[in-house]
Design a protein with these regions (language model features):
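Acidic-and-aromatic substrate-binding clefts and catalytic sites of carbohydrate-active enzymes
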Residues: 1, 11-18, 45, 102-107
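Local beta-strand N-terminus motif with an aromatic residue
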Residues: 3-4, 31-34, 70, 92
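Short amphipathic alpha-helices and their capping/turn segments at secondary-structure boundaries
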Residues: 18-29, 111-119
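N-terminal binding-site loop/beta-alpha segment at the start of enzyme catalytic domains
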Residues: 1-4, 60
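Short beta->alpha linker loops
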Residues: 10-13, 77-79
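Beta/alpha (TIM)-barrel catalytic core signal, keyed to glycine-rich beta->alpha loops juxtaposed to Asp/Glu
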Residues: 42-175
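Active-site groove signature of glycoside hydrolases
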Residues: 26-48
Length: 175
């Protein structure tokens, strides 16, 4: 177990449901702790408000860390605004968000958050390193759980991965 790093997530925003998610993950994984537990899909200010109120999911994360059931706390996010709110209010160990050359060049999405994370020593786990664009026709998407079209050209994939790994990320999740 010490040689494996287990990360789990909860999409629940209240303490009771997020605690059930955690306990279920521990049971299914047959372990008494996970290394990283993440608030998943923090997209809106409402997600932030729900997760951080007195009976919110953050209560579960903090308590679980105190109990030794979780070593590190993190969140996944596609909103710079929400990510900054979370970072300003809690001491997170990691963030999972898109680090992709196209998003940075076209929308300036990422550089500010990368700097904040670097300054606060928050580990960056990169998503969507090989994203190309939204599917033109989502009904014919090749990968059922992938809402964007990944790159399919080997040279572009290599360049995209090289770019993502040139950023201060600790890992990336393909595609």
């Amino acid at each position: 177990r010490k040689q494996i790093f287990l990360a789990c997530k909860t999409g629940k925003r209240n303490s009771q449901e997020s605690r059930l998610d955690l306990e279920n993950s521990l049971r299914l994984l047959k372990t008494d702790y996970v290394d990283l537990y993440q608030l998943h899909g923090m997209k809106t200010k409402d997600d932030f408000i729900q997760a951080t109120r007195s009976d919110g999911a953050m209560e579960t994360l903090v308590t679980a860390r105190e109990e030794g059931k979780v070593r590190y706390l993190g969140f996944s996010c596609h909103s710079i605004e929400v990510a900054k709110l979370l970072i300003d209010h809690f001491n997170f160990d990691s963030i999972l968000f898109p680090v992709n050359w196209a998003l940075i060049l076209k929308n300036d999405f990422g550089p500010e958050l990368i700097k904040i994370c670097k300054d606060k020593n928050i580990a960056i786990l990169a998503l969507k390193a090989m994203a190309h664009k939204l599917w033109d026709n989502p009904s014919i998407r090749k990968y059922k759980n992938c809402w964007y079209q990944p790159l399919d050209d080997t040279k572009m994939i290599n360049l995209s991965v090289k770019f993502t790994l040139s950023q201060p990320v600790v890992s990336f999740l393909p595609p």
